[in-house]
A protein has these predicted regions:
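The feature marks proteins involved in alpha-glucan
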Residues: 1-35, 67-174
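Structural beta-strand segments of beta-rich domains
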Residues: 36-41
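Short proline/glycine-enriched turn/loop motifs at strand-loop junctions of beta-rich domains
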Residues: 43-50
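Beta-strand-enriched, solvent-exposed domains that form extended recognition/catalytic surfaces
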Residues: 44, 59-61, 77
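Short loop/turn segments at connectors of secondary-structure elements within structured domains
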Residues: 46, 60, 84-86
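Short beta-strand elements bearing conserved aromatic residues within extracellular beta-rich modules
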Residues: 50-52, 88
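Short, intrinsically disordered, charge-balanced linker/junction segments flanking boundaries
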Residues: 174-181
């Protein structure tokens, strides 16, 4: 299957100005030349090899080795027959030849803990309901507005646990904010 990236897109990516790269990176269900499957891509500039692994190949990194796109550090592969709900990771072979399993940094969905694999998910099926907010955002000059970056280590704030999940595990941070992922 042909690359899903154009030369112009790779140049924009290398320059750090490819603002829609999330539409290509990660796992995206699609049909190419009448064949249904999933297009995978990841940036791993120092990798010797990158493979897509999952139950569909018994987690064998030799089966679905990705194609390196020139010197961009981007690897990609289209795997026919895969689709929404399939779990996967990237097997990245480092400079020492050691394979490491990594979740997809652009993944849209993940397994529930304690498992850590990414899950193929079609984000095109999601119906966004933020049209008014997006329209208002276009009228704002963000370069002239303040920006807030909030970073904290929740562990350093723990004094007591006030909430537990369905399995009886403590939910950290329940007293600090009302949304957690």
């Amino acid at each position: 299957f042909a690359s899903q990236y154009t030369e112009a897109e790779l140049k924009k990516f290398e320059a750090g100005i490819y603002y829609d790269v999330y539409k290509k990176m990660g796992a995206h269900p699609m049909v190419i030349n009448g064949v249904s499957g999933v297009s995978f891509s990841v940036w791993a500039p120092c990798a010797m090899r990158v493979s897509v692994v999952g139950d569909f190949c018994q987690w064998d990194g030799r089966r679905y080795q990705m194609n390196r796109l020139g010197d961009s550090g981007v690897f990609e592969l289209f795997i026919p027959g895969l689709g929404e709900g399939d779990i996967y990771k990237f097997e990245i072979k480092n400079q020492k030849g050691e394979p490491m399993l990594k979740a997809d940094p652009y993944g849209n969905y993940s397994e529930m803990r304690p498992n850590t694999a990414s899950v193929v998910w079609d984000m095109n099926k999601f119906s966004w309901s933020d049209d008014a907010w997006m329209a208002a955002r276009e009228k704002i000059d963000t370069k002239k507005k303040p920006m807030s970056i909030y970073e904290m280590h929740l562990g350093s704030w723990i004094r007591k646990h006030t909430e537990k999940d369905e399995e009886g595990n403590d939910i950290v941070g329940s007293e600090f904010y009302n949304y957690r992922q």
